[in-house]
Amino acid sequence: MSRSESSRPLLEMRRISKTFPAVRALDNVSLTVYPGEIHSLMGENGAGKSTLMKILSGAYRADAGGEILIDGERIDVDGPLAARDAGVAVIYQELCLAPNLTVAENIYVGRELRRGNRRWGTIDRAAMARGCEDVLARLGAPFGPDTLVGTLSIAEQQLVEIARAVHTRARILVMDEPTTPLSSRETEHLFGLIRQLREEGLAIIYISHRMAEIYELSDRVSVLRDGSYVGTLERESLSAERLVAMMVGRDISGFYKKEHAPYDPGHLLLSVRDIADAERVRGCSLDLHAGEVLGIAGLVGAGRTELARLIFGAEPRTRGDVKLGDRAFGAHSPRDAIDAGLVYLTEDRKRQGLFLDMSVRDNINISVCNRDARLGALDLARGAQRARDAIASLSIRVPNANVNVGALSGGNQQKVLLSRLLETKPRVLILDEPTRGVDIGAKSEIYRIINELARAGVGVIVISSELPEIIGVADRVLVMREGEIAGELGGHTHTPITQEAIIALATGSQAELADAH
């Protein structure tokens, strides 16, 4: 059931503002959503998307002067229970499930069925299991109501959240970056469920940074910028240029444009031969040249991150040789690699890269603080100047260098981590999912930095699951499948770098590769 021009809005958020101490997170924002509509919400990190949805879900109270209407009736969302009773459900990036409880217990949480006395009676688990069988079957769940949630995959746990929303008779479902932890196949299955819910009349508010998802799913797209409403586009009016301009307030032309000179094939920086580990990487070889951006693509589980960590010395290798320039490089630890001029930006910046409870200044300086030591004491002034220079050079949006990194947006956190690596003056830089979880503006700035590094003669390896990104920034692309290099595109092969060619190599579909040419 898609929206018709004559249908009445299901949700109207009018003149919504929210002020925190010294920060106005939302300023007079309005949003209208119809039944049977997938309405995407876009904006850079910090634009106000999450704050607006937390007001809708009852987690925050809006400032005075705004109102929320459902089916034309004004409602007072004074907490999460009020939102649930009004038919609003939210599925956050961090799933809100109890792993030690069953599927049925998670679906009924806060609404448990009891024997006898509804308040004090014992929980009737059998009745709850029976009560959610229909919704699980309706959503095609491959598990039963008595399954422990902790035994399910992330995609299956997400399905439990959707089942809970449907079971509570939610009419408005908010999904915040739901595909971030999913494989391509799991993402397609999720899209099928979202379309099914739309056909059943639910209003879906879909938050994502991924343009391909926005194009594939959206009936309309609304954009926020700096806490204000910018505008709404109908599906037929969508274009990357218009969306990006609305989000960042400026035109980002040549989003993936290669702005560095062709690399020098005679200047080899990194040579890897027959490298392997005990489990995931099975004899991989590659070359990286000065000024080259080398992309590594492949499906989830193909071994891309494992290969990068082997080269970096973060994991032990069972065989293989690595050379930096003309010298053998036997890194036994990341410290060895950094000292030799090879650095690695992890895909998991929060757990493996940043010190979230430390300042921006300390995060930037931590890899090179030994340079500032004088008679055993750190030169704090030099470290502070280095941090200020990095903030200016990488356009890190932060009030000052003393702010904790944990308080920054994803894009600014990524730039802090990248600036730390660049302070080591690397010859080779490995970037693992460098734009994951960052907004459009930050992506553009990261691409600019990659181009600048290549122009300066640094060799850059980019591992990414976003095919347009790989195609746009890389001079050559290696495609991995099941721990091996399945093929090479671009460069001396003269094989065009296309999505079809990458997918064909990643899946082993040689017939599809032939069709691409």
From Swiss-Prot:
EC code(s) of this entry: 7.5.2.7
Reaction catalysis annotation: D-ribose(out) + ATP + H2O = D-ribose(in) + ADP + phosphate + H(+)
MF-aspect GO terms: ABC-type D-ribose transporter activity; ATP binding; ATP hydrolysis activity
One Pfam short name: ABC_tran
GO cellular component, one term: plasma membrane
Keyword Nuclease: no
Name of the top EC class for this enzyme: translocase
Annotated residues for binding of ATP: G43, E44, N45, G46, A47, G48, K49, S50
InterPro entries xref list: AAA+_ATPase, ABC_carbohydrate_import_ATPase, ABC_transporter-like_ATP-bd, ABC_transporter-like_CS, P-loop_NTPase
Coiled coil (residue ranges): none
Subunit structure comment from the entry: The complex is composed of an ATP-binding protein (RbsA), two transmembrane proteins (RbsC) and a solute-binding protein (RbsB).
Similarity-based family: Belongs to the ABC transporter superfamily. Ribose importer (TC 3.A.1.2.1) family.
Name of the protein in its database record: Ribose import ATP-binding protein RbsA 1
Organism: Burkholderia ambifaria (strain ATCC BAA-244 / DSM 16087 / CCUG 44356 / LMG 19182 / AMMD) (Burkholderia cepacia (strain AMMD))
Name of encoding gene: rbsA1
